[in-house]
C-alpha cells in the first residue's frame, strides 16, 4: 500500500528543500516527524506539513496503521520561478527570480 501527498508551488528553492528531504528518506514516520520538528530550517516546516498530510490520507482513505508506515520516497522538483524587479541606481532595474518547488511524499510499508 502506498499513500501520496503533493505540495505544488512551495515558496522555497528546490536546492534548500532537498537538504531536508535527504534527511528523512527511508525513515519511519515517528522518526521522520522528530527530525523535521527539531530541524531549524524553513524547509523542514513545509516538508513536515506534507508528511502529515500523507499520514492523514493514509488514515482516512486507506484505513492504514500509521505505526507501520515509512517514508518510502520523497522527491523535490523545481517549479516555475516568480519573476520580480528591484530598483537599481540611475533608474535601472534588475530581475529577481523567486524559486518555487513541488514536494512529493510517498508513504508505504
From Swiss-Prot:
Could you list this entry's UniProt keywords, alphabetically sorted.
Ribonucleoprotein, Ribosomal protein, RNA-binding, rRNA-binding
As one GO molecular function, the record gives: structural constituent of ribosome
- Output the SUPFAM superfamilies linked to this UniProt entry: Ribosomal protein L22
The source's superkingdom equals Bacteria
Q: Which InterPro entries match?
A: Ribosomal_uL22, Ribosomal_uL22_bac/chlpt-type, Ribosomal_uL22_bac/org-type, Ribosomal_uL22_CS, Ribosomal_uL22_sf
One cellular component (GO) term of this entry:
cytosolic large ribosomal subunit
Residues passing through the membrane, by range: none
User: Which Pfam families does the entry mention?
Assistant: Ribosomal_L22
Q: Which GO terms describe its biological process?
A: translation
The Swiss-Prot or TrEMBL record describes its family as follows:
Belongs to the universal ribosomal protein uL22 family.
Q: What does this protein do?
A: This protein binds specifically to 23S rRNA; its binding is stimulated by other ribosomal proteins, e.g. L4, L17, and L20. It is important during the early stages of 50S assembly. It makes multiple contacts with different domains of the 23S rRNA in the assembled 50S subunit and ribosome.
**Known partners and oligomeric status:** Part of the 50S ribosomal subunit.
What is the protein name given in its UniProt record? Answer: Large ribosomal subunit protein uL22
- Annotated gene: rplV
Amino acid at each position: 500500500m502506498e499513500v501520496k501527498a503533493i505540495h505544488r508551488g512551495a515558496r522555497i528553492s528546490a536546492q534548500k528543500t532537498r537538504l531536508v528531504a535527504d534527511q528523512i528518506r527511508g525513515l519511519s514516520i515517528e522518526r521522520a516527524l522528530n527530525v523535521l520538528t527539531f530541524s531549524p530550517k524553513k524547509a523542514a516546516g513545509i516538508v513536515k506539513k506534507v508528511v502529515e498530510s500523507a499520514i492523514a490520507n493514509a488514515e482516512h482513505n486507506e484505513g492504514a496503521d500509521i505505526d507501520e508506515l515509512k517514508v518510502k520516497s520523497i522527491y523535490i522538483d523545481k517549479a516555475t520561478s516568480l519573476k520580480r524587479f528591484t530598483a537599481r541606481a540611475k533608474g535601472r532595474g534588475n530581475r529577481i527570480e523567486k524559486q518555487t518547488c513541488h514536494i512529493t511524499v510517498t508513504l508505504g510499508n
